[in-house]
């Protein structure tokens, strides 16, 4: 039975009744009497104790605990919160002659995000050169798409001010949210480490900054092979870039456990393939009444949530799941999902995604 702390008013009444039973005829309900003040004071103290007991009860269970207490649960189970990381990647610069680009040289994106060169680069010819730069500030904002223009903040001799991120920057991630941390903790408790089974690979992949969901395919290409794929839901494009795939593959191959300090990772003799899934959009066609902007947004959110929670590479999506998601939105007088009408399936290398909804 759930614990429900008594209200202050009920505690006051209970205390007054106790006084009345001990001192018949004392009438502690009279506000001008000393006994009434004592009853109020005692009830207030008791209310504070009950509220604290209620708070302690919430902290015992990770899913209801405050963030600070959730971190304590995570420490106990060996789950460390992923900290913010800075994006980095190759930047193509153009020089008019041989030159040296000193460490600390900075370039700026149009929206003000700044990137810095870690080590001095000596260039012995004119032309284009690829260098590696890192965002000054850690976080998701540092990730940059392909062919983005950056501009030198401080001019360097013989270096053209405009530079291009031909391959884009990746690796930037914000500090892990409490919800994502709780999800990883629950996974750790429900699927404890087991020497390299499929759940270990999922857990390892999700320990990498930016990774939110991951899947493992045992016997990917036969015995002794494993396939691992993942997505990064906090990005506008959730599908990982080659640099992200490389980071996850390196981490799974072997890494220092963040809690124990021991080297852990894939067992010897296992051939692991880490890959980025391909998007396979599902574009629903839905009739709703009334057709308001608010209902459209609510239905879109419900469908996106359903895709997040229920789809996986190599899985199937029944039309009834979309119908159930739409039916859960309040305010609809009528609706009909006219596509899909058949089960949507994906290969192990594909992930079904919520595409563009056509409103009828």
UniProtKB/Swiss-Prot annotation:
The keyword Glycoprotein does not apply. One of its GO terms (cellular component) is virus tail, baseplate. One of its GO terms (biological process) is viral tail assembly. Pfam families: Baseplate_J. It is found in: Virion; Host cytoplasm. Keywords: Host cytoplasm, Late protein, Viral baseplate protein, Viral release from host cell, Viral tail assembly, Viral tail protein, Virion. Induction: Expressed in the late phase of the viral replicative cycle. Expression of late genes is activated by the viral late transcription activator C. Disruption phenotype: No tail is synthesized. It comes from the Viruses. Belongs to the Mu gp47/PBSX XkdT family. PANTHER family: PHAGE-LIKE ELEMENT PBSX PROTEIN XKDT, PROTEIN JAYE-RELATED. Component of the baseplate. Probably involved in tail assembly. Part of a complex composed of three DNA circularization protein N, three baseplate hub protein gp44 and three sub-complex wedge (made of two copies of each baseplate protein gp46, gp47 and gp48) that forms the baseplate. This is Baseplate protein gp47. It comes from Escherichia phage Mu (Bacteriophage Mu).
